[in-house]
Amino acid sequence: MRGRRLSGPMFDAIAPIRMQRSRGAASVRLGPRGIEDLAQSGSAKAMLPRMTAGRPEIVFLNTAGGLASGDRLDYRIELAPRTQALATTQTAERAYRAKDAPAQIRLHLQVGEGGWLDWLPQETILYDGARLGRETAVDLAPGAGCLLLEPIILGRLAMGETIRHLQLTDRRIVRQDGRMIHHDALALDDAALSRLHHPAMLGKARAMASLALIAPHAADLLEPARAVLDEPGVTGAASAPPGRLILRLLADDGWPLRRQVIRLLRVLRPDPLPRIWQV
């Protein structure tokens, strides 16, 4: 027997099913003696592994497993004066295909006077059709500094995925004592993807990363950083505007990109790499 399409006033009035959206927020405040406040809700979690030496580590996790259309993540870190910490993510963040509203990530990083923060997340992997808007706001008090990393991979390279549709807006703003001292923005859409092979765009690269060191001594590390920009399969450049060291990396694949990032981090910071990176 053939199935029949149900119709009539009762069935015609059924509204389209609305997909459930993921929401997550995690906030950590640290002082010289350790945790002062921790709050988390929804899919966002913040963990602080027990440390025997070095700076405290904050590890963020999105338990939803990735970001789809309309999802939102909010991460916040506040460091008291003279407090140092490292923050990272437990795994790569994934942005899936989105049919309507983009997923959103908001990061607010606040560092007190004389403090220091290393923000070293693992890669963001953008699937074909992903739509993602990310904003990172950093507020530094006088005498504070930070190291910011942002690695991005276009597509699941191991599966041979080609990115044909994408909407990405990614912006980082650093203010010190209320004055903007660093602004970095990236935007990619379908039109930009069609020109990716142009030398002025990404060439054939499918993985990229930016690092920004904000500190009075940043320029002193320019030549040491350039000395290790020789990882096979990676193209890199470094510059040192006043009070900053900026590095850009392009690679055909995520693995050589990660190897180059690790080599740079060993030059730019005295402490060991995040333990979660070694898992």
Curated annotation (Swiss-Prot):
One of its GO terms (cellular component) is cytoplasm. It comes from Paracoccus denitrificans (strain Pd 1222). Required for maturation of urease via the functional incorporation of the urease nickel metallocenter. UreD, UreF and UreG form a complex that acts as a GTP-hydrolysis-dependent molecular chaperone, activating the urease apoprotein by helping to assemble the nickel containing metallocenter of UreC. The UreE protein probably delivers the nickel. Keywords: Chaperone, Cytoplasm, Nickel insertion. The keyword Cytoplasm applies. Belongs to the UreD family. The keyword Transport does not apply. It comes from the Bacteria. This is Urease accessory protein UreD. GO terms for molecular function: nickel cation binding. It is found in: Cytoplasm. InterPro entries: UreD (IPR002669).
